[in-house]
């Protein structure tokens, strides 16, 4: 049950990221069907760089991806039916997590939902430019999740915390 829950958790999170990339890529490409002025190109460059750094590197590579992999490894090593059944939600830190992790996971999710709603009101090419940045960040995130997941399940010691409540009781 543990390994199946871990696989389900990682697959579910990967599908969530992949689905967003799949849905946003055509909108990003559509932006290029419009005539770009110099300021569109400048904004595109800034957005791509910012999203690669802030979302891809800082958000995913330094935080989300290693934590998701660590939580999937936790399911494998500490199998519980609810954790396995709700693997993607467990891996994203929505339950059986430290209080800080749950608050952060829920807050970030709501923030993303609000940003998605707001960006939908933008006209092209602005929406496509922002979506291009999001695709870059999500792509970076998906690749980093695959790499960290591989490391978590092949290394003897994975150095990232799953941020589960039991860790706080030993300190």
Feature names for model-found ranges:
Residues 1-52, 110, 114, 120-138:
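Long, highly hydrophobic alpha-helical transmembrane signal-anchor segments
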Residues 7, 52, 59, 91-98, ...:
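Membrane-embedded alpha-helical bundles that constitute the cytochrome b-like, heme-associated redox core
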Residues 27-31, 59-66, 121-125, 156, ...:
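Transmembrane helix-loop junctions in multipass membrane proteins, especially transporters and channels
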Residues 32-70, 144-148:
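Hydrophobic alpha-helical membrane-embedded segments
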Residues 55-98:
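Membrane-proximal soluble regions of multi-pass membrane proteins
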Residues 82-90, 101-120:
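Hydrophobic alpha-helical membrane segments
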Residues 138, 143-144:
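Surface-exposed extracytoplasmic segments
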Residues 146-171:
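Cytosolic/matrix-facing juxtamembrane and C-terminal tails of multi-pass cellular membrane proteins
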């Amino acid at each position: 049950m543990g390994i199946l829950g871990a696989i389900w958790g990682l697959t579910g999170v990967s599908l969530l990221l992949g689905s967003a990339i799949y849905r946003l890529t055509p909108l990003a490409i559509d932006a290029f069907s419009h005539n770009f002025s110099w300021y569109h190109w400048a904004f595109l460059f800034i957005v791509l760089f910012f999203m690669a750094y802030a979302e891809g590197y800082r958000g995913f590579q330094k935080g989300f991806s290693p934590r998701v992999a660590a939580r999937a490894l936790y399911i494998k090593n500490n199998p519980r039916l609810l954790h396995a059944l709700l693997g993607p939600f467990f891996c994203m830190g929505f339950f059986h997590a430290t209080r800080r992790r749950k608050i952060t996971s829920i807050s970030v999710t709501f923030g993303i939902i609000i940003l998605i709603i707001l960006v939908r009101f933008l006209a092209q090419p602005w929406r496509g430019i922002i979506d291009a940045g999001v695709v870059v960040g999500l792509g970076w995130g998906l690749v980093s999740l695959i790499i960290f997941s591989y490391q978590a399940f092949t290394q003897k010691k994975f150095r990232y915390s799953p941020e589960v409540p039991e860790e706080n009781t030993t300190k």
